[in-house]
């Protein structure tokens, strides 16, 4: 008789907690790691996470700890769900406790500042594990809806198809349907760049520019993502799937999206600092827009929407001026 899959989830924010619900419902033994003792205590005693998923009852089988070694003991999978810019430092602390066969799974959607590395590359750098022990999960997965067990689908990607299939089985439930893929780069890029496009659409919504603008930004944003993906060796079909178009549509259309909400506040006239002050959780696109643009320039890829977001968020350009400049670029064929 095989033992239940053991899963460690590193991060007690809304997405980490929601994914712990999926894993528990799929029959895994789940340990949530969190830095704050009071959050771990609340999860263990009240089976809720009042800070990040208030009102959601967690399965009794989900337990929490602040001890990384305890969380990783016997783990088949370690799911990493921290802000992407903190992964390197956090993983350096956790890596000494990894067991030889534990598969590291990124649930993060970002590109590291300075190095322009994808999260899978940061994992490989820090944990010194081969590609068949690194996987990613990506797709249209807004945490609150997942925690409420509303139907959703996602992509689980690993260079080793058999590992992707094991991961698929570990998180397949009646409401969460994962599909396998071996295009790790494509799945990660889809998730990282959609945060930037989500900011752009949010800014446009905050300015009251309308649905034509939104549709144009989503479509041309997907074109930017695909161009970068092709330059990095990704499969272009990945971007028409759940990790590309699916995630992009959810982020650009939902009030639950942190990046869309952040952009909306900027478009309404808030300053960057004012918007940060009213945002409770990390909007990955705020920092990743710079690293995505860095990555694009390293590969010689033109990403004008991303450039526009960077100019508004980090260079103080007026959204009105930025939109005018974006629309005034020289005309060109669509497929470029």
From Swiss-Prot:
Subcellular localization, as worded in the UniProt entry: Cytoplasm
Annotated GO CC locations: cytosol
Keyword terms, alphabetized: Cytoplasm, Lipid biosynthesis, Lipid metabolism, NAD, NADP, Nucleotide-binding, Oxidoreductase, Phospholipid biosynthesis, Phospholipid metabolism
Family: Belongs to the NAD-dependent glycerol-3-phosphate dehydrogenase family.
Enzyme class at the top of the EC tree: oxidoreductase
Superkingdom to which the source organism belongs: Bacteria
HAMAP family assigned: NAD_Glyc3P_dehydrog (MF_00394)
GO MF term (any one): glycerol-3-phosphate dehydrogenase [NAD(P)+] activity
UniProt: NADPH binding residues: 14-15, 35-36, 109, 143, 258, 284
PROSITE patterns: NAD_G3PDH
Record organism: Streptomyces griseus subsp. griseus (strain JCM 4626 / CBS 651.72 / NBRC 13350 / KCC S-0626 / ISP 5235)
Pathways involved: Membrane lipid metabolism; glycerophospholipid metabolism
Chain's role: Catalyzes the reduction of the glycolytic intermediate dihydroxyacetone phosphate (DHAP) to sn-glycerol 3-phosphate (G3P), the key precursor for phospholipid synthesis.
Name of the protein in its database record: Glycerol-3-phosphate dehydrogenase [NAD(P)+]
Active site: 194
EC number(s) given by UniProt: 1.1.1.94
Residues noted as binding sn-glycerol 3-phosphate in the record, renumbered to the chain: 109, 139, 194, 247, 257-259
Pfam families the record matches: NAD_Gly3P_dh_C (PF07479), NAD_Gly3P_dh_N (PF01210)
Single biological process term from Gene Ontology: phospholipid biosynthetic process
Catalytically driven reaction(s): sn-glycerol 3-phosphate + NAD(+) = dihydroxyacetone phosphate + NADH + H(+); sn-glycerol 3-phosphate + NADP(+) = dihydroxyacetone phosphate + NADPH + H(+)
């Amino acid at each position: 008789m095989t033992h239940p899959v053991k899963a460690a989830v590193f991060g007690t924010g809304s997405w980490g907690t929601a994914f712990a619900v999926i894993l528990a419902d799929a029959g895994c033994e789940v340990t949530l790691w969190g830095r704050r003792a009071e959050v771990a205590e609340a999860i263990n005693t009240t089976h809720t996470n009042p800070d990040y998923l208030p009102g959601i009852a967690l399965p009794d089988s989900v337990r929490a700890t602040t001890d990384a070694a305890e969380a990783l003991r016997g783990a088949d999978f370690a799911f990493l769900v921290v802000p992407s810019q903190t992964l390197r430092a956090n993983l350096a602390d956790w890596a000494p406790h990894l067991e030889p066969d534990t598969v590291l799974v990124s649930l993060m959607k970002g590109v590291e500042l300075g190095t322009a590395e994808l999260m899978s590359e940061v994992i490989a750098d820090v944990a010194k594990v081969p590609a068949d022990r690194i996987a990613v999960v990506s797709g249209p997965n807004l945490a609150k809806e997942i925690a409420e067990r509303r139907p959703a689908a996602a992509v689980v990607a690993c260079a080793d198809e058999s590992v992707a299939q094991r991961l698929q089985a570990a998180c397949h439930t009646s409401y969460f349907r994962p599909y396998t893929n071996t295009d790790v780069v494509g799945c990660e890029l889809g998730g990282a760049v959609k945060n930037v496009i989500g900011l752009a659409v949010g800014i446009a919504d905050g300015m009251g520019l309308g649905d034509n603008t939104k549709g144009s930004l989503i479509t041309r944003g997907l074109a930017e993502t695909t161009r970068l993906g092709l330059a990095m060796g990704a499969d272009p079909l990945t971007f028409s799937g759940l990790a590309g178009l699916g995630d992009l549509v959810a982020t650009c259309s939902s009030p639950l999206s942190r990046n869309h909400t952040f952009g909306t506040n900027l478009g309404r006239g808030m300053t960057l600092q004012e918007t940060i002050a009213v945002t409770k959780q990390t909007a990955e696109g705020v920092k990743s827009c710079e690293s995505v643009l860095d990555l694009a320039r390293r590969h010689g890829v033109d990403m004008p929407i991303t450039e526009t977001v960077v100019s508004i968020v980090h260079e103080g350009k007026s959204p009105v001026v930025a939109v005018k400049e974006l629309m005034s670029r020289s005309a060109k064929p669509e497929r470029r």
